[in-house]
Design a protein with these regions (language model features):
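Rhodanese-like catalytic fold shared by cysteine-dependent sulfurtransferases
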Residues: 2-6, 17-51, 59-92, 101-137
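Short, surface-exposed ligand- or partner-binding patches at beta-edge/loop junctions that are enriched
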Residues: 96
Length: 137
């Protein structure tokens, strides 16, 4: 048993490092928080769209229908891109990318800039397609 314990501990630590975003979870970060949303929940939200919908993936890998803007995740805080965003920092903004990682980074950046109603599509376009919804290529 003593020989197995270090391997078991290592397996637990490694599996924790590969965690995926929890859908519906509010993600607390240094300057505030953003919320992860599932593909199914986003599809429901799209029926009464009351948000700015932004693809932050780079390079281009497709779009979800009704996307409002495409801004590279690492350029979302640049003044010419900020000028495309709502002036109201409480406006709802939903971000997505291919897998969810770039949109998490962009969500954190927008929260650090004072935006308070940021949503992230957990799993990105991959999750969207896996849920049976289409992508415009």
């Amino acid at each position: 048993m003593k020989k197995i314990f270090p391997f078991l501990l290592a397996a637990i630590v490694l599996s924790a490092c590969q965690s995926k975003p929890v859908v519906g979870e509010t993600v607390a970060i240094e300057d505030g928080s953003y919320r992860n949303v599932s593909a199914q929940e986003l599809n429901t939200m799209m029926k009464e769209k009351d948000f700015v919908f932004i693809n932050v993936h780079t390079p281009f890998a497709g779009l979800i229908t009704d996307t409002d803007l495409s801004i590279p995740y690492d350029e979302i805080g640049v003044p010419e891109n900020l000028s495309q965003l709502p002036i109201d920092k409480n406006a709802k903004i939903v971000l997505y990318c291919r897998s969810g990682r770039m949109s998490e980074i962009a969500a954190s950046e927008l929260v650090s800039l004072g935006y308070t109603n940021i949503w992230n599509l957990a799993g990105g376009m991959v999750a969207w397609e896996q849920a049976g919804y289409g992508i415009e290529k």
